[in-house]
Amino acid sequence: DKSYSLLLKILKEEYHKKPSGSKIKNPLEYILQLTEALQIKEIDATIIVFFIKQQGMDLFNQQNVKGWDGGKSWLTSQLYLQRNNVSDLLCNGRNINRKTFKNLPENGEELKISLEKIDIRINFNPKGTNKQIIKELSDAYLFQIDENIQKDKEAILKYDFDASSKNSQQAVVRLFNFITKSPEFQLI
């Protein structure tokens, strides 16, 4: 009975620090979350493998028995920029391919290759107000929200937003794109 109570104590009280928000998404988690949220069905698995390899996660060539370094190595400034560019492409309904990664624009230049158009959608409450939809997406995809980011999101999805209008999907996708570019989206 003593060992049982000790084991119970260890399992219930072992670690007081909350682990959420302390880990950076690895490239696979990142791209799969994007494709799932945007409900992309026709993305080529080899493109996902190529993307995560470009991000430093070669699935079939781990650095050692332990696996990948993880942690902060998943998010250098170059990898963060590449993630933002991929998010832009997908949120604009453009499929990614190998040429995309070789020709990613720098410093706001236009992308010079033609990309296949894909259908994207974000699930949201069609009867919700702008603040309800912002909260819904923030709760689903962000670890924490600060006041400045909240104001920026409210500038994207304005107070007079009508969730039942025909352009509501594009507005919510713009909001999602903004969310994906925030540092908080990179955290688990």
Label the predicted regions.
Residues 1-188:
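Flexible, low-complexity segments enriched for small/polar residues
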